Amino acid sequence: MRLWLILILALASLCGDAVAQNVAIADATVYPSQGAPLQTHTTILIHAGKIAAIGSNLPIPSGVRVLPCDGCIVFAGFWNTHVHFAGRQWDNSDRAPADQLSRDMQSMLTHSGFTTVVDLASDPINTTASRRRVESGEVAGPRIYTAGFGLYPPHGIPFYLDDLPATLRARLPQPATPAAAVEAVQQNQALGTDVVKLFTGAYLTPNNITHIPLDIARAAVSEGHRHSQLVFAHPSDLQGVRIAVDSGVDVLAHAPDTVGGVDDALVKEMVARHMAMIPTLKLFSGSGHIDRIREIVLQFHTAGGRLLFGTDTGYLTDYDVTEEYRQLELAGLSFRDVLSMLTSNPAAEFNVSSHAGSVRLGGDGDLTILSADPAVGDLRNFAHVLYAIRAGRVIFEAPPQH
């Protein structure tokens, strides 16, 4: 408590704009981390982007913005590890009006509580421009990791990208040799990308999948790892998963949706290779194989695999993520399982657990605040977002209910 009081006094001694950026959440119910006990009637103070104090009956310095809470539910900031800044609203992100970009971020991402997102294929020029403006404080948005352009099989652009403008489509890498794959990864990196995305299995038509040759996939993975970048793969089917496993991919960007041959032995091999998986079950909810896809996700989890939350938002133009929570519950995952997917698991995957993925003193001031507790009743309560706070800045605030 003495340390907290020192920090509070330090907050109180500040003046001007710095105080205006400090935030307090009072009388909250807090889930500090996936396995930690619930804390009730708790106050959290954020200063300079970090959690400066946590406790009961803490005095709140004057000048600090206090968010109305009344028993609201507080978590570490949610991650969405599969999004795409792919719509026309992201064109010319370097010069689009800041208030419009903030509204677009809210519409697609922050209204669902996401304080960190991973973009798994978009035009890197636009996405890095958006990220730059978010980081400067000009635009209210989440922390953004980006893959830039995904790498496709030779002559392997998926059919669902047929409507892309010809100029953009011509820029999509389809490396035909290992050297070309290395060059494509390097070109992305030169534009400021953070991760690598491979389409190890790509749908040329709804019933025809083509694949990246293994030597090309291995070259891309090796180049990504040489720069300490995680490598994600869109697998599609058994062969796409097999290439991802054998090339050293870190994360499956989807559960496989053409499920033939994907058996328990392969799932256990993925876990043994320390691969993670993003289920994206809403994407497949209309599939005739959805029951089996959910089974694969649960098998992976039960075998000890790390699941990450992601929705393919941006490719999916319906930005409501409620169905993803419903599908995860139907798959047999618990509240604590899904909370890990949203917080501690992605923080661990991105090697930032020392300061992200939990609510703790000195940690990042990234919080997602809900109006209803998903531990009680329905996992869809994860979508009932009151506030999203990123580094102490409120980047989403739900409109008042009358």
Language-model features: locations:
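C-terminal cap of metal-dependent C-N hydrolases
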Residues: 348, 361-402
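His/Asp/Glu-enriched, well-ordered alpha-helical/loop segment
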Residues: 292-374
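Divalent metal-dependent hydrolysis catalytic cores, especially in the metallo-beta-lactamase
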Residues: 104-128, 141-149, 193-203, 230, ...
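Alpha-helical scaffold segments that flank or form the walls of functional sites
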Residues: 92-140, 172-194
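Histidine/acidic-residue-rich, glycine-tolerant segments that coordinate divalent metal ions
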Residues: 136-243, 258-261
